[in-house]
């Protein structure tokens, strides 16, 4: 691409710089072509991260980190895609929260008892809770997603409430659980 030039590589990444006047659609077109060529030549689909615009060479490290964060988020989504960090602000916030001790404590306070129970007894309560929160407490959709009979789901929900002390009929509790699960996904990457 005439407005893109290669600036370096690491074992699992490469870097491109674009001129300031290039449109996002042109960057996307160029990245899709790179993705296609890598697949054609090496048989591998890659996730590409694109940082925000920088105005000084002093910002290269920050831009590199933002692009790497975009890649991490893209991989977490389970897709091999082109990820612009500017389109991933909420996920970026979760990624950053996962680094903070206060959020680690928040996650532990919310889920530690359940995680320990699942590990000790081989129960699927954490996954059940995650799915219930993703479906905003809708029991029918949760049961269908987990391929469970509604009575089995009702039993699991009662046990989860007993173990956590949480009221899973409360929308605020489900919101909190959903938030914690999103942060937890990025914490697990850091172990």
Go through each PLM region and give its residues.
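Cytosolic nucleotide-utilizing catalytic cores of signal-transduction proteins
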Residues: 1-191
């Amino acid at each position: 691409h005439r407005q893109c030039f290669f600036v370096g590589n690491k074992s699992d990444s490469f870097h491109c710089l674009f001129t300031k006047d290039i449109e996002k659609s042109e960057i996307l077109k160029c990245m899709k072509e790179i993705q296609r060529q890598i697949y054609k030549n090496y048989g591998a689909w890659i996730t590409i991260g694109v940082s925000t615009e920088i105005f000084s060479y002093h910002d290269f490290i920050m831009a590199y980190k933002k692009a790497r964060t975009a890649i991490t988020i893209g991989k977490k989504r389970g897709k091999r895609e082109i990820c612009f960090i500017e389109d991933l602000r909420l996920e970026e916030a979760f990624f950053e929260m996962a680094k903070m001790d206060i959020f680690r404590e928040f996650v532990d306070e919310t889920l530690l008892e359940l995680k320990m129970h699942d590990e000790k007894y081989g129960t699927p309560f954490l996954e059940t809770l995650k799915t219930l929160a993703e479906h905003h407490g809708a029991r029918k959709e949760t049961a269908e997603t987990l391929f469970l009979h509604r009575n089995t789901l009702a039993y699991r929900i009662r046990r989860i409430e007993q173990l956590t002390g949480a009221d899973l009929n409360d929308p605020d509790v489900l919101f909190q659980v959903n938030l914690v699960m999103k942060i937890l996904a990025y914490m697990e990457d850091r172990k």
